[in-house]
Amino acid sequence: MRDREQARARRVVLWIYLVATVVAVLITWPLAAWHPIARTLAATLVATLVVFAGSRLFDNSSIYDPYWSVLPIALALWHEHDAPDDASGGRQALVLILVLLWGVRLTYNCLRGWTGLGHEDWRYREFRTSWGRWYWPGSLLGIHMFPTLLTWLGCF
């Protein structure tokens, strides 16, 4: 039964992240005139809002946890695709491979230890208790948006 619950939880997270990815890509089209870094910021923030909505829907902020390792992969792929024609192909390929290896390993480790939608990081449970009714606004800003901005900044 535990394996089934884990598999279901992983499918839920996968769907949330797929929707976040589609929404992030769609938001960049009307922003085509923006600088590529500004477009990735907008896409990243919108994707984070989708993941937050999934966290809220399933009452579990740990749904965000893989984002730390998935976002750099998405940004590396985006910048590889959006790179100028005169960019160093070898260097781009090396960076992409390294980010992919790192991100896949970290995502695997994150999901391996996650037992399902009933499991939430102990720190988030403590925040729930101490923040009370302010937990979800705090989760949006402190657990979702702030780490997203740090991760986005770390990709440059």
PLM regions and their residue ranges:
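Membrane-anchoring alpha-helices and their flanking helix-loop junctions
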Residues: 1-156
